[in-house]
Amino acid sequence: MITLDALNEYDALTVWKSHLAGVIEENPFMQKDLDNIKTDPKAFQRLFEQVTNRWISGEHDRESAPRWKDFKARVTKGLRTIMDGHGPGSEIAVVTSAGTISVVMQQSLGLSDKKTLELSWQILNSSVTRFRYNGDRIALSGFNDISHLDATGNSDFLTYR
């Protein structure tokens, strides 16, 4: 087993702290969601979507905060390290998070940043996504498979965060 920091999730807490005030300033009506964040899970999701949309736009980048383009570059480098180290046809398991998976999906499907972010909201914890690599490109071969969780009969295992 090896560990590649390049495939770690983005620092969501720092992204949140870096962009939340701007989201509220640009959308004052969202203050209500912030006020209800501890009692309404949907309020958090609405705010977090706005925070991450602001983040991926790149229009509010600061040196002191993570940048979307840097996250994508890091994941791409990590993916390249795996592909170069194992070659086409190898079977490799990578355990990571929705943000990282969505960036690889973006590369394999040619998605925009916005669609990539939207896709990331659909990725279930512990789901399995499969890719194939032929030496030139990476292609999606399965997405968000939860059959191993369904087999337990316990829907409590189906979570998004």
Over which residues does each language-model region extend?
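Glycine-rich phosphate-binding loop signature in dinucleotide/nucleotide-binding domains
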Residues: I82-S90
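Conserved histidine-centered catalytic loops in small-molecule metabolism enzymes
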Residues: M1-A6, K32, F44, F48, ...
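Short aromatic-enriched loop/helix-cap "lid" or pocket-rim segments at secondary-structure transitions
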Residues: A12-S18, Q107, T152-S155
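Beta-strand elements within well-structured catalytic alpha/beta cores of enzymes
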Residues: S90-T96
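Phosphate-coordination/substrate-recognition cap region in phosphate-metabolizing enzymes
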Residues: M1-E49
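Surface-exposed cleft-lining segments at the edges of enzyme active sites
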Residues: I56-D70
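Domain-level recognition of soluble alpha/beta enzyme cores
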Residues: I2, S112-R137
